[in-house]
Amino acid sequence: MPIIQVNMLEGRTTEQKRSLAKGLTDAAVQALGVNAQSVRILIHELEPEHFAIAGVTAGEKPLANGNGGAR
């Protein structure tokens, strides 16, 4: 039973998270040859103040890649 954990900044829509879960499930089925019913996806949403690069939190300076989680 594959368990896939995703950590990402909060702010994405329910539809985006559902799409991500579906895509990851499909990828696991194809790559690992498992049944889709056995795939578990855990999405952990992080507050911007709980994610930092080089000591600067995403709340202080939004990430430059347009991550969708910046406020």
Question: How should these model regions be labeled?
Answer:
Residues 2-71:
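A domain-level signal for the structural core that forms small-molecule/cofactor-binding pockets
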